[in-house]
Amino acid sequence: MKKLIWDVETTDLELLIRTYQLKNYIKYFDPKTIRRDWSMLGASWMWLDDDKPKVISVTPDKPLDDYEVICALHKVLGEADMLIGHNCDQFDIKKFNTRAIFYDLPPVAPKLSVDTLKVARKYFKFTSNKLSYLCDFLKVGFKDDSPDWQKILDGCQKELRYMRKYNKQDVIATKAVYLKLMSYHHTHPKNPPTRDIVGEIVNICPKCRYPESIKVRSRPLASGRARQQYQCKGCFGYWTTDLIK
């Protein structure tokens, strides 16, 4: 299973606001007030087994032209079996789809997804679920300070270079958080079972593929079959299979 860790960076939205009450304006947003719609500034990704992420971005002279970014991301997303990101289900994939359909690109086939923000909210009670906080709390790396987005829109090459570095560091941080949280994620998508040369199923962790595990307990089912629970010695996650006699 090919697992892709990814992150995108987008511009803000520029609006012309004329209102007597700001809360009413926000509630009854009129798209006619859009002076500049958002677009994608860059994207970074890496396969789970890779050491370094890749990145693509707009150019300083055309900071609002994200066609090449979307095309590159469209290709790599199409190669993945599972997507991993922080808030990727609500932000990254929807932002990508919006720009993809803008350019009349075909949809990427549905993927398995692990959103580390959802995992953090479901299984824990962290004081904050922001990626920067999780990195500090879990002691697994760091998240850089955000770039000056306006400078990038103004064509600043130095700030664009920093954004590319920032984008890659987000992917590295997401990978570290994912690996730390994975063993607690009981509904994590499972890798297909591994078989040896004679076709017998090998008891490898379906989450991290670590080859060593311990038997925890077995339990009978109403159907008369039995299930065996294992714990991985690598990621310490649990999984259950049919009892092998």
Predicted feature descriptions by range:
Residues 209-213, 236-239:
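Cys/His-rich microdomains that often coordinate metals
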